[in-house]
């Protein structure tokens, strides 16, 4: 079954260099899932913290469900990520390196469950960002030139 992306963190790919990525489940309430299906999420300031052998998604904004009642969820609450123990240990080792952090790259639906795509990332400097933009534009020019001369 195909997975459907519902929230993406496009700014993360601009500001960070992704070293490694993996998928994790997430513990959500019913109104959070309904809100995410309406594309009511934002991962702009979100990051992952590991404490006491558990991974937590912090600062991820899921808009309150518009048809929710008094039991609606908090917008920026701490959400637990579902990972195996060895995956959490691997992430802890990566984060121990200088300048590496764990950023959510996107959320998607897979078989009715919401999954989070995580990335071990290192921050880019401004000149690295410029080099990435220049390389992307060169690839675009080459592709258009190849398309013209076929």
Curated annotation (Swiss-Prot):
Coiled coil: none annotated. InterPro entries: SmpB, SsrA-bd_prot, SsrA-bd_prot_CS. GO terms for biological process: trans-translation. It is found in: Cytoplasm. GO terms for cellular component: cytosol. Keywords: Cytoplasm, RNA-binding. It comes from the Bacteria. GO terms for molecular function: RNA binding. SUPFAM superfamilies: Small protein B (SmpB). The keyword GTP-binding does not apply. PROSITE patterns: SSRP (PS01317). The keyword RNA-binding applies. Belongs to the SmpB family. Required for rescue of stalled ribosomes mediated by trans-translation. Binds to transfer-messenger RNA (tmRNA), required for stable association of tmRNA with ribosomes. tmRNA and SmpB together mimic tRNA shape, replacing the anticodon stem-loop with SmpB. tmRNA is encoded by the ssrA gene; the 2 termini fold to resemble tRNA(Ala) and it encodes a 'tag peptide', a short internal open reading frame. During trans-translation Ala-aminoacylated tmRNA acts like a tRNA, entering the A-site of stalled ribosomes, displacing the stalled mRNA. This is SsrA-binding protein. It comes from Chlamydia abortus (strain DSM 27085 / S26/3).
